[in-house]
Curated annotation (Swiss-Prot):
(6R)-10-formyltetrahydrofolate binds at R64, M89, R90, I91, L92, N106, T140, D141, E142, L143, D144. It comes from Escherichia coli (strain K12). This is Phosphoribosylglycinamide formyltransferase. The keyword Coiled coil does not apply. Inhibited by N10-(bromoacetyl)-5,8-dideazafolate. Belongs to the GART family. N(1)-(5-phospho-beta-D-ribosyl)glycinamide binds at G11, S12, N13, Q170, T171, Q172, E173. CDD domains: FMT_core_GART (cd08645).
Length: 212
C-alpha cells in the first residue's frame, strides 16, 4: 500500500508511521512526505528514512484552490492508496477532500466532536475536563467533523500544564494512528454513507473505542 503523509511541523506522528511500516505493523510504505513549511522537522525525519520530500509554500499560489490543485498533482505521482494528515495545518479545499474521499485520514488532539479546531489542550484545561484525548477520523468537508474511527482517552490531573497534556496525548496518538492505518492497509476499514466501517460493521459516532 502506498502512503503519502502531509505535515507542517515536528512530524512525531509521521515517525510513528515510518516505524510501523519498518516493522510491518503497517503493510505499506510511505512513498512521500509533503509540507507547507520548508523548516518542518518532519521533512528531515523523512529524508533520514530515505523518503521523498516536497515543500509547497502557500504564498507561491494565488488561492487555496490553486495550491490544492498543485498538491493533488504532485501527490498523485505517488499513486497513493491513502493520504494521511499528520499535523498538516491547512484547511483543505472541497476539491481536495473530494478527490481523496474515503482514503484521507486525519488525527485531531481532542475527543471529537469536542474541541474542533485549534488549542484543544488549553480548552480542556480551562474547562476543567477530567479526561481529554485524541481522535483519528476520515476527512470530509466539515472541519474536524468526518466520521471518527478510533479515539484514545487520557486523564487530566490537577496542576497539569498544556505541555503535560500534549505529551500524554501524543503518546496515545503514536499508538492509535499507525493502528488505524494498518486497518486501512488490510482492507478492514472503509468510509461508506458518511460513516466509518470496520470489518463490515458500522462504527458508532465516536468510533471503535467509544465504549471503553
Amino acid at each position: 500500500m502506498n502512503i503519502v503523509v502531509l505535515i507542517s511541523g515536528n512530524g512525531s506522528n509521521l515517525q510513528a508511521i515510518i516505524d510501523a511500516c519498518k516493522t510491518n505493523k503497517i503493510k505499506g510504505t510511505v512513498r512521500a512526505v509533503f509540507s507547507n513549511k520548508a523548516d518542518a522537522f518532519g521533512l528531515e525525519r523523512a529524508r533520514q528514512a530515505g523518503i521523498a520530500t516536497h515543500t509547497l509554500i502557500a504564498s507561491a499560489f494565488d488561492s487555496r484552490e490553486a495550491y490544492d490543485r498543485e498538491l493533488i498533482h504532485e501527490i498523485d505521482m505517488y499513486a497513493p492508496d491513502v493520504v494521511v494528515l499528520a499535523g498538516f495545518m491547512r484547511i483543505l479545499s472541497p476539491a481536495f477532500v473530494s478527490h481523496y474521499a474515503g482514503r484521507l485520514l486525519n488525527i485531531h488532539p481532542s475527543l471529537l466532536p469536542k474541541y474542533p479546531g485549534l488549542h484543544t489542550h488549553r480548552q480542556a484545561l480551562e474547562n476543567g475536563d477530567e479526561e481529554h484525548g485524541t481522535s483519528v477520523h476520515f476527512v470530509t468537508d466539515e472541519l474536524d467533523g468526518g466520521p471518527v474511527i478510533l479515539q484514545a482517552k487520557v486523564p487530566v490531573f490537577a496542576g497539569d500544564s498544556e505541555d503535560d497534556i500534549t505529551a500524554r496525548v501524543q503518546t496515545q496518538e503514536h499508538a492509535i494512528y499507525p493502528l488505524v492505518i494498518s486497518w486501512f492497509a488490510d482492507g478492514r476499514l472503509k468510509m461508506h454513507e458518511n460513516a466509518a466501517w470496520l470489518d463490515g460493521q458500522r462504527l458508532p459516532p465516536q468510533g471503535y473505542a467509544a465504549d471503553e
